Amino acid sequence: DLLGLHRSVSVEARRLIQEATGIPPQNVLISATHTHSAGTALGKNRYVNEQELDNYQRFVARRIADGVRCAVNALRPAEIAYGTIDVPEHVFNRRWRMREGSVKPNPFGKTDGVQTNPPVASPDLVEPAGPTDPAVSILAVREPGGRLICVYCAYGLHYIGGTGPAHISADYYGMFCEALKRLQPAAHQPGGDAAPPFVAMLANGTSGDINNIDRLHPRPGRKPYEQMRDVAEDMAQKVNAAL
C-alpha cells in the first residue's frame, strides 16, 4: 500500500525473486494500490525510467521478494477461477466538461475545456469527459474441491481518503481485504503448515480519471474512515456473493 511504485523497484524485486525462487522476471506481475495516506516508493525523481534505489525502495523490493518466497514455500495443488462483477455505484469520472468561459486559463495561457475535480454541484458542470469502468475483476484460487486459498481483485477507483490527521492507512483496499476475510470460513480455520491463512488482495485498476466523489449530488460530511469503510464493505459483500 503506497502512493506509488517506481519501475526500478519492480525491476529489483523481479531480480530478487528470480534469485530466491528461480521464477523468471517475465513471469512476475507486480501490482499496487494508490493511497495518499501511506509512504512512497517512487524515489527522488518519479519521471525518469531508471534510478538508483534509496533505502526504503530497497526495503520494499526485498519485502515483495520475501512474499513470493513464502508463497512458493507453501505451494500446493489448486484450482483457479476468474470472472468479473459490476459495481458502478462507487465510481465517478472526475474530469468534467465545463460551461464555456467558466475555466481559468492554464499556465500556458490557453483555456482547457475540461477540468479535473471541479466543485461539487457547480452550475458550470456540463457532463463527464469520459466513462467509468464499473468492473471488479476477480481471480480466486482454492484447494481442489475445498477451501479458498486466496482471492485477488482489481477495481478502477482512486483512493477514497478521509483518514484522521497524519494517519497511515491502506484506505479502502485494506478495509476490503479485512471485510472479505471476515466473510470467508477459510479465514477462520486453524493455521499451521496444513492450512495457510486465507489471503485477500485488492489492486488499484486503471483509475486516473476516476474517484468516489459524485459531482452532481453533494454528500453530507462523514467521520474519518466512514466512507472508505462503506465502500469496502459493500464491495466485499458483492465479491463474496460472486465466489
Regions found by a protein language model. Name each.
Residues 231-241:
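Long, well-ordered mid-to-C-terminal structural blocks that present hydrophobic/aromatic surfaces
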